[in-house]
Amino acid sequence: FTEHIFARTDLSTREVLMRTALLPWMTGAIAEEVSGHPSAAQIVRDLYRRGLFVDRRADAQVRYQYHDLFREFLLDRCHVHYEREELSSLKRTAAKVAEKYRQVDTAVDLYAETQAWDELSRLICELGETMLVQGRFQTLQRYISLLPSAEQQQRPWLLYWSGMSRLVFDPVAARADLEAAYQQFERTGDNIEG
């Protein structure tokens, strides 16, 4: 049934559906931004009105979310429809949109999937202090662990945030991370206070 509905839509609509499926939820503005299509919001609203695979939530804003199986189908179609490089580019765009609209877990996962280490590292460093204050030590550690070890080792701020996030649970590893961060800061002349 899903395949039948999908096949009967025009190419532009199929692309909107596949691109918006890269995010777990969207507003009309997010749909348009992530798909690059000015009618994306209308397409998603129409699917909802027709009762086709879309849920709607209204809190501070109206958000749409594809049914899980439909989203999974669309994500599978992305891998068939797009070449690897184009799909990677679309995922990076989706990561930037997710970050902009505070879908942090999604942004982190998409940056990691596309091996956008600079963007992922920047985002982690921007979030590090806030996450520690919120007590989200393990989530911060999960984010950092998505980067390959070699990437972590050459980024003193990642080592610093890794050490800080481990202090409570693994003080020995925390000390190793913090010492490595200190050595990196010394070597690069970077200022830990800045």
Q: Regions from the language model: what does each represent?
A:
Residues 2-79, 179:
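C-terminal boundary/linker of central alpha/beta nucleotide-binding cores
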Residues 2-6, 91-98, 186-187:
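General secondary-structure propensity
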Residues 12, 80-173, 177-180:
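Extended alpha-helical scaffolding segments used for macromolecular assembly and cargo binding
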Residues 8, 36, 59, 97, ...:
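Transmembrane alpha-helical segments of multipass membrane enzymes and assembly factors
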Residues 98, 178-179, 185-194:
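Short, intrinsically disordered, charge-balanced linker/junction segments flanking boundaries
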